[in-house]
Amino acid sequence: MAFPFTSIVGQEEMKLSLILNIIDPRIGGVLVMGHRGTGKSTTVRALAEVLPLIDRVKGDIYNRTVEQYIEMESGVKGAPVLKASDVKTEKIPVPVVDLPLGATEDRVCGTIDIEKALTSGVKAFEPGLLAQANRGFLYIDEVNLLDDHLVDVLLDVAASGKNVVEREGISIRHPARFVLVGSGNPEEGELRPQLLDRFGLHARIITINDVAKRVEIVKLRREYDENPEAFLKKVVRQQQKLQKEIVAAQKLLPKVSMDDSVLTDIARLCMALGIDGHRGELTITRTAHAFAALQGDTNVTMEHVRKIAGLCLRHRLRKDPLETVDAGEKIDRELAKVLGEAEVAA
């Protein structure tokens, strides 16, 4: 049992970032940077327990839905044509997979037994961590210390939703759609800008310096450790309420729209901040849609954009060693200018 998500004190940026990625995984995951001991891994596991159980084919290592299973297995040469009624299912918690710092590419992506494939003609595939993470979370602690090549591979798979393993002319592919969560301490090293840009959102975690909140954190944790079952019973209604809000937002998301005027202001903001490429606009657009759905709104406004702009853009700003303005302040300042220009134009 994980510490309940709704009882985590503070760290609103991280909590919101995770929820938005659950509503729309196309946002592209979240990078959480901050000091150690601030609840990063606790929060990820806590959110997974809030989410409703998922249906998968019974015993399937890839956590596939019936539709995914039939599509993949029916495509195998010589395999019988399957119907949904032929496939047994089971309910499981949303998977949370930890990627250890020393993991190899084979451990992450999976391996093909070439000898067995050549001698028996069977594609002998040993699934990796990406298979286990399908339809869940892949959590990487100290992502800034992970090999750059491996981070590249993970980001490519997270973006495509598929893992492809190729060895000696043999190719295996399987679904690997997950929310990628990377965390780290900026004092131990930064990610390359090219990799930073690939994460959808960037949440900052700070050590809470409010005495009352620090006392509350200790009290809640001690109460939970002494009797987890009793503690969870106390907060079950808050947990259920959050679950309903997330499920409702997922259902509402396809109905959310955005006017061209809002999209124009988003593009103007990214230009004013000197954001390279177009990932900035794409991420803000998707995140604003998810945030609007979470609020129960069907039309994205610039107020929604204002709430999530920092999460989407702070890690995409060009770094100027002489600049003293905080990234969040810079985004807020330029956003105010854009909104002012929009009001004048109107």
UniProtKB/Swiss-Prot annotation:
GO terms for biological process: bacteriochlorophyll biosynthetic process; photosynthesis. Its EC number is 6.6.1.1. Keywords: ATP-binding, Bacteriochlorophyll biosynthesis, Chlorophyll biosynthesis, Ligase, Nucleotide-binding, Photosynthesis. ATP binds at G34, H35, R36, G37, T38, G39, K40, S41. Pathway: Porphyrin-containing compound metabolism; bacteriochlorophyll biosynthesis. It holds the Pfam family AAA_lid_2. One of its GO terms (molecular function) is ATP binding. InterPro entries: AAA+_ATPase, CHLI-like, ChlI/MoxR_AAA_lid, Mg_chelatase_ATPase-isu, Mg_chelatse_chII-like_cat_dom, P-loop_NTPase. It catalyses: protoporphyrin IX + Mg(2+) + ATP + H2O = Mg-protoporphyrin IX + ADP + phosphate + 3 H(+). Belongs to the Mg-chelatase subunits D/I family. NCBIfam families: BchI-ChlI. Involved in bacteriochlorophyll biosynthesis; introduces a magnesium ion into protoporphyrin IX to yield Mg-protoporphyrin IX. This is Magnesium-chelatase 38 kDa subunit. It comes from Chlorobaculum parvum (strain DSM 263 / NCIMB 8327).
